[in-house]
């Protein structure tokens, strides 16, 4: 039974950590081939949003005529005009703004990893962890094999979170023109604000994960891995269980980052 788990960990660790090393710490640029479908959907949403501005102007006129008889309708003609212009510009320039935001988030995430004395290459680090897991497994130590399996499962969850994050990013890109047009009226402004929190949140996830990885590398990982028997984690005791537990802790914190960010996205929208 222990041999079966070892074969499972060995066969699964390489492709899973290959996924993690190549994807998890970044977001594809807005002009990348992966974002072609998102750009196409953004163009469709832009057409719909620009068409709906006629309806928004009509609703704004109705709010002006009702005066202050409706909640959130305290609006002057000047404020309505400023809101309409701002919403129109935000809707039609949203793709450019998102592109700059992605570049900024990628650059900030990279800065956390490459700044300081020890530069961290997530690709090299993932390869080392995958090799380290294989060397830590012992035919006579089933518990270490189960811990190694837990590391592989958590790494798979981290890759799955990346896929979900990119999917949500593409949805937010596609919905940007329609969501931002709701800045035009006070009654619908909350929808546009929710979009801003959403796009900020999905980009903040990779930055926070990079910060966690950089901090963990400085505190837990060996600065001279070649001097401690090839160990990745920087504890000279060579305790395999402790190495695996530290890897599990690191991956668990990185997996929890999206849920912490999600709270900040949704909480302001709650009554």
Please tell me what each predicted stretch does.
Residues 1-52:
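Binding/recognition "hotspot" determinant
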Residues 176, 180-182, 187-202, 206-207, ...:
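Extended serine/threonine-enriched, polar tracts that run as long, contiguous segments within proteins
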Residues 52-88, 175-189:
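Hydrophobic transmembrane alpha-helix segments characteristic of membrane transport
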Residues 2-12, 86-107, 197-211:
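Hydrophobic alpha-helical membrane-insertion segments
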Residues 45, 87-171, 175, 214-263, ...:
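Non-cytosolic segments of integral membrane proteins
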Residues 56, 60, 80, 84, ...:
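Alpha-helical transmembrane spans of integral membrane proteins, capturing the lipid-embedded, hydrophobic core
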Residues 50-57, 163-167:
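Selective recognition of hydrophobic, aromatic-rich stretches within alpha-helical transmembrane segments
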Residues 38-41, 73-89, 188-203, 233-238:
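Membrane-interface segments at loop-to-transmembrane junctions
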């Amino acid at each position: 039974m222990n041999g079966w788990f070892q074969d499972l960990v060995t066969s699964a660790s390489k492709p899973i950590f290959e996924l993690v090393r190549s994807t998890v710490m970044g977001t594809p640029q807005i002009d990348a081939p992966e974002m072609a479908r998102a750009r196409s959907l953004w163009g469709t949403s832009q057409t719909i949003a620009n068409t709906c501005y006629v309806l928004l102007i009509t609703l704004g006129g109705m709010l002006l005529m009702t005066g202050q008889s409706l909640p959130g309708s305290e609006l002057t003609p000047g404020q309505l005009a400023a809101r309409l212009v701002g919403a129109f510009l935000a809707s039609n320039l949203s793709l450019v703004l998102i592109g700059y935001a992605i570049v900024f988030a990628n650059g900030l995430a990279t800065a956390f990893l490459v700044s300081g004395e020890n530069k961290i290459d997530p690709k090299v680090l993932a390869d080392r962890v995958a090799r380290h897991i294989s060397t830590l497994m012992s035919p006579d130590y089933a518990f270490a094999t189960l811990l190694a399996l837990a590391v592989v499962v958590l790494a798979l969850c981290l890759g799955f979170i990346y896929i979900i994050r990119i999917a949500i990013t593409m949805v937010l890109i596609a919905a940007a023109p329609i969501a931002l047009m709701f800045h035009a009226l006070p009654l619908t402004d909350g929808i546009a604000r929710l979009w801003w929190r959403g796009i900020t949140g999905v980009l903040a996830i990779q930055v926070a994960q990079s910060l966690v990885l950089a901090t963990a590398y400085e505190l837990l990982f060996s600065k001279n891995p070649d001097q401690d028997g090839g160990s990745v984690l920087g504890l000279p005791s060579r305790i395999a269980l402790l190495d695996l537990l530290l890897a599990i802790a690191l991956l668990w914190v990185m997996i929890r980052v999206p849920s912490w960010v999600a709270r900040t996205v949704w909480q302001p929208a709650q009554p």
